[in-house]
């Protein structure tokens, strides 16, 4: 989480104090404070795990940011979504050019030269409770036979399967999901497909907790940040790694059919 300086704490405290006489915050979980364009800008950020107590509401979480971050910088149109992700407990999954690519708003925070895929990656949606148990298939090494799964796009609002998780250890797993263009996903039609990524919950904020491992030669080029991994897979492609074989059996406009099988050590 970003470290909030003392001046920012003072700004939030005074703002809440002034508004408290007119606003009942008892049913509020998050608050966004938009500041004027001061000569010395207020640092943008989220309070993270440490919040404020107002109207009997403890751990009151706040995002602050200058007016320009909302309305005058097109490349920061996902800024509020990114900071709100922190309020909900998500960490940075930087650095995106070698790790999560452009597939999560917590990792592609400032990507202005290529399409930003401003949705949350499946693991983060699962963490937030946005995916039900029926939308996630979890497997571990006790499943030795080949399994088949029909994945639907992570950004499509439907009750269908969205995510496959392959447990590697107590802190590690492989995530498999389908990315298609949607309201939040600005991925180009030719770049759509299945991605596979490694999750390691022991890796600290900003150190690459999520890393795309499928099709590492597939990249996007960004003028500011260089190449970032794309990693999408289409019909007929397969991935071998971490003791698993994952193959895309078929794909259409609505779904991809994926087979998963353990690869026994020789």
Feature roles, as predicted:
Residues 1-80, 88-99, 198-266:
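Propeptide-to-catalytic entry region of secreted or membrane-anchored zinc metalloproteases
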Residues 25, 30, 38-187:
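Extracellular hydrolytic enzyme modules, especially secreted metalloproteases
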Residues 145-151, 164-166, 176, 196, ...:
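Hydrophobic beta-strand residues in large extracellular and virion-surface proteins
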Residues 157-162, 190, 233, 240-242:
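Residues that act as N-cap/strand-start positions at coil-to-secondary-structure junctions
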Residues 173, 193, 254-257:
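A generic structural signal for beta-strand entry/edge sites
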Residues 187-194:
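Short coil-to-beta strand junction motifs in C2/discoidin
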């Amino acid at each position: 989480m970003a470290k909030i300086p003392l001046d920012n704490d003072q700004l939030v405290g005074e703002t809440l104090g002034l508004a408290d006489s007119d606003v009942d915050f008892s049913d509020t979980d998050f608050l966004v404070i938009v500041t004027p364009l001061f000569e010395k800008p207020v640092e943008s950020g989220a309070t993270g795990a440490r919040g404020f107590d107002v109207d009997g509401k403890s751990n009151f979480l706040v995002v602050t940011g200058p007016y320009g971050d909302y309305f005058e910088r097109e490349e920061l149109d996902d800024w509020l979504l990114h900071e709100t992700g922190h309020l909900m407990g998500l960490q940075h999954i930087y650095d995106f050019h070698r790790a999560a690519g452009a597939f999560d708003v917590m990792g592609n925070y400032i990507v202005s030269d290529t399409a930003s895929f401003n949705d949350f990656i499946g693991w983060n949606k699962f963490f937030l409770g946005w995916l039900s148990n029926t939308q996630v298939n979890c497997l571990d090494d006790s499943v030795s036979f080949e399994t088949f799964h029909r994945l639907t796009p992570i950004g499509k609002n439907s009750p269908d399967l969205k995510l496959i998780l392959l447990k590697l250890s107590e802190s590690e797993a492989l995530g498999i999901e389908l990315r298609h263009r949607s309201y939040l996903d600005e991925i180009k039609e030719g770049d759509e497909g299945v991605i596979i990524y490694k999750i390691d919950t022991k890796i600290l904020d900003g150190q690459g907790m999520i890393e795309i491992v499928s099709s590492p030669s597939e990249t996007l080029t960004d003028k500011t940040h260089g190449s970032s991994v794309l990693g999408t897979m289409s019909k007929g492609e397969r991935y071998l790694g971490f003791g698993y074989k994952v193959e895309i059996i078929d794909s259409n406009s609505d779904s991809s059919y994926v087979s998963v099988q353990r690869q026994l050590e020789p």
